[in-house]
Amino acid sequence: MRLELGKIFIKDVQFGEKTTVEKGVLYVNKQEIIDLAMQDDRIKSVNVELARPGESVRIAPVKDVIEPRVKVEGSGAMFPGMTNKVKTVGSGRTHALVGSTVLTCGKIVGFQEGVIDMSGPIAKYCPFSETNNVCIVVEPVEGLETHAYEAAARMVGLKAAEYVGKAGLDVEPDEVVVYETKPLLEQIKEYPDLPKVAYVHMLQSQGLLHDTYYYGVDAKQFIPTFMYPTEIMDGAITSGNCVAPCDKVTTFHHLNNPVIEDLYKRHGKDLNSVGVILTNENVYLADKERCSDMVGKLVEFLGIDGVLITEEGYGNPDTDLMMNCKKCTQAGAKVVLITDEFPGRDGKSQSVADATPEADAVASCGQGNLIEHFPAMDKVIGMLDYVETMIGGYKGCINEDGSFDAELQIIIASTIANGYNKLTARFY
């Protein structure tokens, strides 16, 4: 499967009469986005605001973040099974408005939604302090059930991102990158002397607002499967969860997975990247046994030499992580885990909730329990009403001027366990 990704670099975002891209500036028609969102009768009101790097702006509670993209050539359309009919994606040509996002925020869905600061000392922890953000502030109708509100907000974000992405349809990209993964036997024959490496991609699927979707299917409902990495770049996987914000894999992070990106960069040089093994993180032990068994069988069946594993969330999913590690090792593969840590505020507790002797190679994406001071900002997009009850916050943490103290895990993507962040841990 071969995908050309045309990157259109966005250096600013402004409101305009027409949603278009001109000389690196993304112009968006505010009313058209509002009208699109208000087609859902579960939504009471919508506002659209802009947040740019360096501005004194805080965004909260953030639900999902999405990079606007559009299919130019090839099968299917963005977000199959969600905003478009189910059809295999990952081939042809796709344009991305790099440096911009569409994000949803507003009244909290669950307690695990996050904060983005566009400037100040906290901005360095979040990648979205460096992007030009179209912020959709959503308010649900009175009495709407929580799951229905999550679904409505999720669809508003995806539809708005697809709408904005179409502005790049006829724009000549600043850069075109080609990604190609061939059918398995052909791929193996191409580099027979290089180690065969697969990426085991664990999707959040604990339920109770901890959900991820594969071609529109709730990840709880499938068993491990094998897929082309480029399918993920075309929106085959979308976020639908309110997991702890620090390691929440937003839809943006699925589209821009750094593990996939780095495997492509090293493909044909020192490794043979053969594809993605997709699995989930269901809560019941029987599900964990079943799915980790199948991950191990796929690794054995495909003759994989090396495996990289990422998880989403912490606590319960740490067991899936360790079971996958153990069974991939038993299948004959060398395994590296990529995860974040939660050792407590004093740093003395066990960093993950489970362990196995086979987990002897780990890349850390940082720890989420460090307390930082969040200074007041001139503007808040959304609201700060829920800071005390959000993961990382605590009773009495917020001050009258809007400043507060909280753990890093309240920040979107601060310790995201696929490496799209700036934190890590080192031995001294």
Swiss-Prot record:
Q: InterPro entries, alphabetically?
A: Gly/sarc/bet_Rdtase_B_asu/bsu, Gly_reductase_pB_sua/b, Sarcosine_Reductase_Comp
Known EC number(s)? 1.21.4.3
Q: Which residues form a coiled coil?
A: none
User: Which major enzyme category is it?
Assistant: oxidoreductase
What catalytic activity is recorded? acetyl phosphate + methylamine + [thioredoxin]-disulfide + H2O = sarcosine + [thioredoxin]-dithiol + phosphate + H(+)
Give the modified residues of type Pyruvic acid (Cys). 242
What keywords are assigned to this protein?
A: Oxidoreductase, Pyruvate
The GO terms this record gives for MF are:
sarcosine reductase activity
Post-translational modification, as annotated: The peptide chain is cleaved into beta and alpha chains, and the alpha chain N-terminal cysteine is deaminated and oxidized to form a reactive pyruvoyl group.
Q: What is this protein for, i.e. what is its function?
A: In the first step of sarcosine reductase, the substrate is bound to component PB via a Schiff base intermediate. Then the PB-activated substrate is nucleophilically attacked by the selenol anion of component PA to transform it to a carboxymethylated selenoether and the respective amine. By action of component PC, acetyl phosphate is formed, leaving component PA in its oxidized state. Finally component PA becomes reduced by the thioredoxin system to start a new catalytic cycle of reductive deamination.
On subunit structure and binding partners, the annotation says:
Heterotetramer of two alpha and two beta subunits. Component of the sarcosine reductase complex, together with components A and C. PB is substrate specific.
Q: What is this protein called?
A: Sarcosine reductase complex component B subunit alpha
Q: Which organism is it from?
A: Peptoclostridium acidaminophilum (Eubacterium acidaminophilum)
